[in-house]
UniProtKB/Swiss-Prot annotation:
Catalyzes the isomerization of 2-oxo-tetronate to 3-oxo-tetronate. It catalyses: 2-dehydro-L-erythronate = 3-dehydro-L-erythronate; 2-dehydro-D-erythronate = 3-dehydro-D-erythronate. This is 2-oxo-tetronate isomerase. GO terms for molecular function: hydroxypyruvate isomerase activity; metal ion binding. The keyword GTP-binding does not apply. The lineage of its organism: Bacteria, Pseudomonadati, Pseudomonadota, Betaproteobacteria, Burkholderiales. SUPFAM superfamilies: Xylose isomerase-like. Belongs to the hyi family. OtnI subfamily. It comes from Cupriavidus necator (strain ATCC 17699 / DSM 428 / KCTC 22496 / NCIMB 10442 / H16 / Stanier 337) (Ralstonia eutropha). The gene is otnI. PANTHER family: HYDROXYPYRUVATE ISOMERASE (PTHR43489:SF13), ISOMERASE (PTHR43489).
Length: 260
């Protein structure tokens, strides 16, 4: 049976961030995820989780200067020291909050960049991150992201993500499979899930093409949830979408899966 985590960076924007935990729990969610925890004390976030009976599925390591347009550091030559600092901080937060998944963003690469050098940097940084996280029982995730939403992002395809994980060779390095990004970049989502399930550490969903609720758009999510069940996926499914109107009003798709 699929288990869903509300993405508090995109959902429940009707509420102040710290109030989104209670709102998600009231709608039946038992887990949450979000992009970055670092504007709040880890202990405060843990208190919100505990007060509402929620599990933290994952969050991201800091991506560099998000406001300046940075979208990760892992594949950026010359930023290795900055990257390592983000891993240490993310693991400190995870140690308090209790999540066992951290997403590490690759970064934006100029069109004329030396991609081989960027890839070598990426592999080295991911090996460092996985080694540091292993001591804490944490899995590091990398996510192929579509270039329509994020032009220049280094990692775009599922097969490339899987190949990178295999090349690094760390048991706690896996792919964060976002059905939305996969559909936009390459399609054939069900077959990609079947092919790659052993290397998938987290799944996310959203309607395609506008990233609204999963019951809107071209993907048949009830079928994909059946595929995930058949494959034995028992992790959280992150709801990383932008509600068309009120978050709670758009949760009709979720109701059949609550209490099953």
């Amino acid at each position: 049976m699929p288990r869903f985590a509300a993405n508090l960076s995109m959902m429940y924007n009707e509420h102040a961030f710290l109030d989104r935990f209670a709102a998600a729990a009231a709608d039946g969610f038992r887990a949450v995820e979000f992009l970055f925890p670092y504007e709040h004390a880890a202990a405060e976030l843990r208190a919100r989780l505990d007060a509402n009976g929620l599990t933290q599925a994952l969050f991201n390591a800091a991506p560099g200067d998000w406001a300046a347009g940075e979208r990760g550091l892992a594949a950026l030559p010359g930023r290795e020291a900055d990257f390592r600092g983000t891993i240490g901080r993310a693991l400190e937060y995870a140690g308090v909050i209790g999540n066992d998944r951290i997403h590490v963003m690759a970064g934006l690469i100029p069109a004329d960049a030396d991609r081989a050098r960027c890839r070598a940097t990426y592999l080295e940084n991911l090996a460092f991150a996985a080694n540091a996280a292993a001591a804490q029982g944490v899995t590091v995730l990398i996510e192929p992201i579509n270039t329509r939403d994020m032009p220049g992002y280094f990692l775009n395809r599922q097969d490339d993500g899987q190949a990178i994980c295999k090349e690094v060779g760390a048991a706690n390095l896996k792919v964060q499979f976002d059905c939305y990004h996969c559909q936009i970049v390459e399609g054939d989502v069900a077959m990609k899930l079947k092919r790659d399930i052993a290397g998938i550490g987290h799944i996310q969903i959203a309607g395609v093409p506008e990233r609204h609720e999963p019951d809107v758009g071209e993907l048949n999510y009830p079928y994909l949830f059946e595929v995930m069940d058949t494959l034995g996926y028992d992790g959280w499914i992150g709801c990383e979408y932008r509600p068309r109107a009120g978050t709670s009003a758009g949760l009709g798709w979720l109701k059949p899966y609550l209490g099953r």
